[in-house]
């Protein structure tokens, strides 16, 4: 599946809103912190 990384707000629930928690055969929303997001960008 293709991972779509969603940057979570600094404060708030650690889970994605229901409207964004869409799982299909090709898409998977992965909530990450901003630091984790930039680390993944560096590895890519």
Curated annotation (Swiss-Prot):
Major localization class: nucleus
Domain of life of the native organism: Eukaryota
Subcellular location as annotated: Nucleus, Nuclear pore complex; Cytoplasm
Gene Ontology process terms (BP): mRNA transport; protein transport
GO cellular component: cytosol; nuclear pore outer ring
SUBUNIT field: Part of the nuclear pore complex (NPC). Forms part of the NUP160 subcomplex in the nuclear pore which is composed of nup160, nup133, nup107, Nup96 and sec13p. Nup85 may also be present. This complex plays a role in RNA export and in tethering Nup98 and nup153 to the nucleus.
Main function: Functions as a component of the nuclear pore complex (NPC). Involved in poly(A)+ RNA transport.
Protein name, per record: Nuclear pore complex protein Nup160
Organism: Xenopus laevis (African clawed frog)
């Amino acid at each position: 599946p293709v991972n779509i990384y969603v940057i979570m707000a600094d404060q708030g629930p650690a889970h994605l809103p229901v409207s964004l928690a869409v799982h299909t055969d090709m898409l998977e929303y992965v909530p990450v912190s901003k630091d984790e997001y930039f680390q993944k960008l560096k590895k890519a």
